[in-house]
């Protein structure tokens, strides 16, 4: 390997980089064909060649690395794009891509990320699907912090620097849906609504909603194509973008109202745009709920229903806790309807996720978490669980009861409530009248005589809606 290095040192930077690519193709391709699977790892000498002659980070501090000019760097990107486009074997492409851009935990990682961001951005512009497919696998196996950095580079190129370039990114969905699925996951991890800068740009939001409404199965693409028993590396992105999109939908009513309030303070309020954002998030929320239903079908077909978690309980608990803090912090500044909208979306998502098997969590545990949230009628019903059916011999008009999720507040529907009364059936031929302090007791089992002179009762006379129940709805 030292002979190869000395030969490469005599070449110009661009020629040396091409020679390293050729060397990787020969050595890793041969190793892949001779073994049953991909090589476990690269030799240290091979890694050093890649770092020194492609990313220009020399292992020898005494030797000044040859830096490429901007034109040479662009030429190198074209060479890499052409190599992956011409390589017909997907397994070899994946191995070479991993050899180039797998992070090693050293000073060369910054150069790797810089080159990777430019390569993926260029591949989107010229639609190099093989590189986008390799980048999708990279996003699936790499720590989320690096994935977020790559997503940030792409968002700056296609949403910030050249806003009209978003249409180029939008067209990639049909060419490489796997890459788009992973990009959505990375983008939802990038934009967490903590600041105005970390709020999804309108063009990005509109593009993602268009992708998902056109084909909601896009969100499950990585999950469906991954082995069910496979374990992801520690710290990597979620297996689906569902949790990240759910976080967007729940936090959007709070964050966007904050943004509009700031804009109106500065005299730049735009109500029409705010309404458009709200509609986009409503569409996105509906699509997420629909994907949960699709997920249930897939889990049932694979005999993994209620056996494989898709939404980690820890992540859902963190979201609930975060929403609680935001509601408490922003309550004096927000209209109550915005907080209720956020809680409504959270309640709907939790109910559908539990019903479809995406969230495996005891309802009692969720009830304890949600008890810290502001009161919300829908969340109250969801966390209370199924309706408690009355005993078979009780009154037909006795209301069903829900246990309250706020333990410090007694439920008005408690069976021990002093306002609870029992109604006897109006159709019983022998009505038992109980004793009353101001009236004489009637003989037991005294049949009531028919009143022929009275007009016939309306068929709706004993409809439950016509009876005033002694309880109030949950508020």
From Swiss-Prot:
Family matches, as Pfam families: INTS15 (PF14964)
Highest taxon, organism lineage: Eukaryota
GO BP, sorted A to Z: RNA polymerase II transcription initiation surveillance
UniProtKB keywords: Chromosome, Nucleus
Major location category of this protein: nucleus
Parts forming coiled coils: none
Region feature (Disordered): 402-444
Residue spans of biased composition, Low complexity class: 416-430
Subunit structure: Component of the Integrator complex, composed of core subunits INTS1, INTS2, INTS3, INTS4, INTS5, INTS6, INTS7, INTS8, INTS9/RC74, INTS10, INTS11/CPSF3L, INTS12, INTS13, INTS14 and INTS15. The core complex associates with protein phosphatase 2A subunits PPP2CA and PPP2R1A, to form the Integrator-PP2A (INTAC) complex. INTS15 is part of the tail subcomplex, composed of INTS10, INTS13, INTS14 and INTS15.
Family: Belongs to the Integrator subunit 15 family.
Name this protein carries in UniProt: Integrator complex subunit 15
Gene: ints15
């Amino acid at each position: 390997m030292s002979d190869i290095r000395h030969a490469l040192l005599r070449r110009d930077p661009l020629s040396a980089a091409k020679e390293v690519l050729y060397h990787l193709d020969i050595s890793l391709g041969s190793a892949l064909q001779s073994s049953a699977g991909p090589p476990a790892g690269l030799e240290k000498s091979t890694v050093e060649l890649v770092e020194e002659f492609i990313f220009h980070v020399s292992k020898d501090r005494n030797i000044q690395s040859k830096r490429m000019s901007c034109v040479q760097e662009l030429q190198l990107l074209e060479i890499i794009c052409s190599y992956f486009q011409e390589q017909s074997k997907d397994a070899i492409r994946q191995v070479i891509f991993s050899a180039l851009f797998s992070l090693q935990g050293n000073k060369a990682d910054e150069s790797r990320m810089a080159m990777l961001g430019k390569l993926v951005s260029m591949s989107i512009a010229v639609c190099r699907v093989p590189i986008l497919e390799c980048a999708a696998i990279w996003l699936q196996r790499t720590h989320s912090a690096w994935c977020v950095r790559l997503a940030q580079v792409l968002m700056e190129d296609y949403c910030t620097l050249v806003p009209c370039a978003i249409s180029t990114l939008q067209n990639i969905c049909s060419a490489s849906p796997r890459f788009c699925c992973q990009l959505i996951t990375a983008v939802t991890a990038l934009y967490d609504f903590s600041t105005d800068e970390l709020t999804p740009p309108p063009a990005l939001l509109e593009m993602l909603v268009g992708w998902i409404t056109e084909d909601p199965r896009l969100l499950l693409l990585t999950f469906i194509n991954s082995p069910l028993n496979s374990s992801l590396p520690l710290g990597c992105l979620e297996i689906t973008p569902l949790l990240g999109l759910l976080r967007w939908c729940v936090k959007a009513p709070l964050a966007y109202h904050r943004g509009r309030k700031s804009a109106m303070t500065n005299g730049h309020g735009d109500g029409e745009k705010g309404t458009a954002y709200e509609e986009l998030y409503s569409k996105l929320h509906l699509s997420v709920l629909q994907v949960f239903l699709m997920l249930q079908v897939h889990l049932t077909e694979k005999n993994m229903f209620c056996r494989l978690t898709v939404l980690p309980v820890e992540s859902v608990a963190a979201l609930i806790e975060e929403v609680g803090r935001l509601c408490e912090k922003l309550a004096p500044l927000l209209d109550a309807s915005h907080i209720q909208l956020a809680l409504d979306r959270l309640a709907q998502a939790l109910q559908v996720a539990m019903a479809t098997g995406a969230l495996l969590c005891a309802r009692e545990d969720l009830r304890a978490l949600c008890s810290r949230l502001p009161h919300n009628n829908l969340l109250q019903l969801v966390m209370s669980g199924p309706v408690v059916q009355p005993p078979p011999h009780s009154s037909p008009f006795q209301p069903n009861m829900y246990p309250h999720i706020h333990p410090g507040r007694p439920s008005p529907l408690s069976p021990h409530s002093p306002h609870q009364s029992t109604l006897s059936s109006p159709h019983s031929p022998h009505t038992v009248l109980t004793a009353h302090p101001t009236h004489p007791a009637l003989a037991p089992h005294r049949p009531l005589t028919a009143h022929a002179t009275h007009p016939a009762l309306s068929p709706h006379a004993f409809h439950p809606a016509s009876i005033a129940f002694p309880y109030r709805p949950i508020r």
